Amino acid sequence: MSGYVCKTDILRMLSDIEDELTRAEQSLNHSVNALEAEMRETENDRLSVLEEEIIDLHICINELYQSPEHRYAFEKVYRIG
């Protein structure tokens, strides 16, 4: 058995390695894109929750501000007026 490897075999191995690296890069890009999409979705979900909480808070503040006794207490506590 000879330890000799011909140039053609080496070029074929390098080509195979290049193909594997290309597939790995494509797989990695796909995974990164999926992760980014998931992160955007999570961020949008969080923003939606915050928006709902802000609306609820705004409603509560408006309700507190409607009655005179609550308005006085509200202004006194939060120094609004």
Swiss-Prot record:
Domain of life: Bacteria
InterPro entries, sorted: DUF5446
Pfam families in the cross-refs: DUF5446
UniProt name for this protein: Uncharacterized protein YppD
Encoding gene per record: yppD
